[in-house]
Amino acid sequence: GIPCAESCVYIPCTITALLGCKCKDQVCYN
């Protein structure tokens, strides 16, 4: 997928989650 410029190591995807991004390998991907 496309990296969403947000990490999800300590907290889940927040802003980018609204854009359909999901956590994968500690990084939010679209």
Curated annotation (Swiss-Prot):
SUPFAM superfamilies: Cyclotides
Gene Ontology biological process terms from the UniProt entry: defense response
Keyword tags: Disulfide bond, Knottin, Plant defense
Pfam families, A to Z: Cyclotide (PF03784)
PTM summary: This is a cyclic peptide.
Disulfide bond keyword on record: yes
Disulfide cross-links: 4-21, 8-23, 13-28
Superkingdom in the source lineage: Eukaryota
InterPro entries named in the record: Cyclotide (IPR005535), Cyclotide_bracelet_CS (IPR012323), Cyclotide_sf (IPR036146)
Signal sequence, start to end: none
Annotated crosslink Cyclopeptide (Gly-Asn) location: 1-30
Family: Belongs to the cyclotide family. Bracelet subfamily.
Domain notes: The presence of a 'disulfide through disulfide knot' structurally defines this protein as a knottin.
Functional summary from the UniProt entry: Probably participates in a plant defense mechanism.
Official protein name in the record: Kalata-B17
